[in-house]
Amino acid sequence: SILAAVIAPVAVMAWGPARPSFTIEKPADYITFNSITNNPVIGGDEKDFVGIREVGSNANWTNNMKVQNGKEYYVRIYVHNNAASNLNLVAENVVAKLNVPTTTAKTVTVQGQVSASNAKPNTVWDEATFSSDNDFNLAYVAGSALFENNGMGTTKLPDSIVNNTGATLGYSKLDGKIPGCFQYAGYVTVKVKAQVNQPQEKTDIDLAKTVRNKTNGEKTWTETVSA
């Protein structure tokens, strides 16, 4: 029940907003996203629903990734309506967004959002951070956004996922409707490419000019000479 829900601390968490938490054994009795704390599918707490992994790697999803120049990385957003299945509560107008900053810096944080018009709260978000020893930027790889679930398999999403419009999700089709329960959950994946500024090598050459007066029989080079 709502009364049994626990408000989780957010002081050191890169997610929000603060909201009640639920468990597999005691799911929500209303529509809310990514608030179950013991989901083994994503390693425990669903509030940590944004992850990073290098394309082509089988490594675990992580919240922090040190980038290499020219490499591509997946950003994953988990999407799960936590309403108990027996309540038949369907989330409406479900939209996913990924904010990929265009800044150049040594750390760049991306933010994933999942929204629904009848969810409480309407929007939940989580962050993950890329880093490098040198300044870099992230570029969204156009056409890379996908949604994977049991209802549709893998479905292409529009590039609007990385702007304010976002991408509409769904279960059996992209109609914005996602019922409550694990079987209706899904994953959004997006590719980004790292462009690292390469440090410039020092090319300045210090030249020293020396002369000698051959007519005076000088055999050593000096910086000045008497005529």
Give the ranges of each region predicted by the language model.
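C-terminal segment of classical bacterial N-terminal signal peptides
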Residues: 4-13
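Exported/extracytosolic protein signature
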Residues: 13-227
